[in-house]
């Protein structure tokens, strides 16, 4: 387990930040606040991918964010303000925070500093902050090293992170597949010992599973890992799953292959119950 403060890495990175974010950053800096690019955009840039979405984090409180942005002429939305998140110019800006309560939507938040914000994140590779002033990555948990080694590791105790939101188990699997790497032993053991997805909606499980298939460098290995960690039967509960995996990244083809031993009508009824769309159910059942 990596503990906060074990490691602080400041590594240079040339991140092509959109011009409107640069403008937002400029007015935050003018008003004495920090603004970082966080999470997936930083991870993808390190991997040599072009980031699609840019999430931002700041030490400014939500009301301060809104005030600064409006004075700067940016459109704002207060959706999520109670949880420290607002939209500025279409970009999500979150105040450094600690979640109170479990699950995807905490009951409340406490505001904190960058170190506290890092500790609420799921995986080390998603806990990287890009400092636009210095063109540097701030890494408090060894995420850069884990990315280079293609190792999936949680921030802090794995069981605690998964207890906060069990969907994180599927996210860990997805990222292990998408980077073509391995799962840290503690993370793998935590999932295998308690693969439960209790409290997670069928829609979220479906969406995460589909993303896992589509983004995996080797879908066969992704599914084998899901099976070995005893979580695959909870992704497709009630089915007799075919364990002869293929490498296709087409999730329709892949799910049809997983259910090839099942009765046609059971597939239709089961997938409907798991919130697959009418078209998805039709396409998958057609291939059975």
Where are these regions (language model features)?
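Catalytic cores of the polymerase beta-like nucleotidyltransferase superfamily
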Residues: 2-288
């Amino acid at each position: 387990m990596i503990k906060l403060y074990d490691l602080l890495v400041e590594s240079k990175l040339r991140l092509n930040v959109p011009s409107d974010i640069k403008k937002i950053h400029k007015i935050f800096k003018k008003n004495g606040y920090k603004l970082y690019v966080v999470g997936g955009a930083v991870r993808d840039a390190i991997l040599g991918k072009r980031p699609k979405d840019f999430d931002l984090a700041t030490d400014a409180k939500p009301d301060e964010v809104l005030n600064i942005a409006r004075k700067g002429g940016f459109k704002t939305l207060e959706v999520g303000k109670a949880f420290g998140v607002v939209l500025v110019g279409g970009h999500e800006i979150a105040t450094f925070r600690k979640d109170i309560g479990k699950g995807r939507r905490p009951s409340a938040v406490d505001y904190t500093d960058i170190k506290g914000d890092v500790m609420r994140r799921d995986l080390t590779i998603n806990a990287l902050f890009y400092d636009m002033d210095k063109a540097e990555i701030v890494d408090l948990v060894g995420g850069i090293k884990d990315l280079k080694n293609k190792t999936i590791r949680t921030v802090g105790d794995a069981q605690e992170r998964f207890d906060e939101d069990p969907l994180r188990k599927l996210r860990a699997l997805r990222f292990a597949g998408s980077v073509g790497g391995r799962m840290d032993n503690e993370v793998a053991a935590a999932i295998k010992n308690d693969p439960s997805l209790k409290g997670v909606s069928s829609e979220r499980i479906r969406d995460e599973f589909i993303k896992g298939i589509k983004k995996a460098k080797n879908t066969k290995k992704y599914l084998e890992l899901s099976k070995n960690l005893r979580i695959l039967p909870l992704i497709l509960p009630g089915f007799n799953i075919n364990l002869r995996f293929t490498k296709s990244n087409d999730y329709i083809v892949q799910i049809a292959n997983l259910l090839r031993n099942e009765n046609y009508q059971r597939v239709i009824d089961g997938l409907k119950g798991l919130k697959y769309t009418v078209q998805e159910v039709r396409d998958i059942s057609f291939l059975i």
